[in-house]
């Protein structure tokens, strides 16, 4: 059989690509070296839907992290997959590290990513298991986690 498109890899990226291409009248095949969907990097990743505050300005990663994070709640709703809004803390234990938090906050402002600074005490009130050495926290309340294998399987 001849195919219009062959996708190499049945992880979350290949599966999502196959789902998008299924909207068109194309013959699409998905190939993977593993014996099942999402058995490679997808199975072993952190499952965090990154909001996009970390990548350097002007990079494709910065652009796509922000766009993807904003799309994921709808994607998971459409696919009937779980998504959990956990939020994320980036912590500082010194003045030098606090300066790095300021850089991340500037990126978040430019990218319109919700964030807020917390004192070490305020952060401990939310998460008591944090180190006592924490002086400042940058909170990203819209950070979420998914089950990547669930999303990959739902796409197929």
Which residues are covered by each model-predicted region?
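Dinucleotide-binding Rossmann-like beta1-alpha1 core, especially the glycine-rich loop
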Residues: 47-126
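Glycine-rich FAD pyrophosphate-binding loop
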Residues: 22-44
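Aromatic/hydrophobic pocket-lining residues that form π-stacking "cages" and hydrophobic walls in ligand
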Residues: 17, 72, 104, 154-155
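The feature captures the short pre-catalytic strand/loop hairpin that immediately precedes
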Residues: 132
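Short hydrophobic/aromatic beta-strand or adjacent loop that forms the aromatic wall/cage
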Residues: 88, 135-137
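Helical element adjacent to the flavin cofactor pocket in flavoenzyme catalytic cores
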Residues: 138-156
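N-terminal Rossmann-like FAD-binding beta1-loop-alpha1 element of flavoenzymes
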Residues: 3-30
């Amino acid at each position: 059989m001849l195919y219009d498109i062959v996708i190499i890899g049945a992880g979350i990226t290949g599966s999502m690509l196959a789902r998008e291409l299924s909207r068109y009248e194309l013959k699409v095949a998905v190939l993977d070296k593993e014996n099942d969907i999402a058995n490679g990097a997808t199975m072993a990743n952190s499952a965090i839907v990154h909001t996009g505050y970390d990548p350097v300005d002007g990079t494709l990663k910065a652009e796509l992290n922000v766009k993807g994070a904003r799309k994921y709640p709808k994607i998971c709703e459409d696919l009937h997959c779980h998504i959990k809004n956990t939020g994320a803390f980036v912590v500082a234990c010194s003045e030098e590290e606090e300066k790095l938090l300021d850089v991340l906050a500037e990126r978040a402002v430019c990218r319109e990513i919700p964030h807020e600074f917390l004192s070490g005490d305020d952060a401990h009130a939310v998460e008591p298991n944090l180190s006592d050495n924490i002086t400042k926290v940058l909170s990203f309340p819209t950070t979420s986690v998914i089950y990547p294998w669930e999303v990959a399987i739902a796409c197929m």
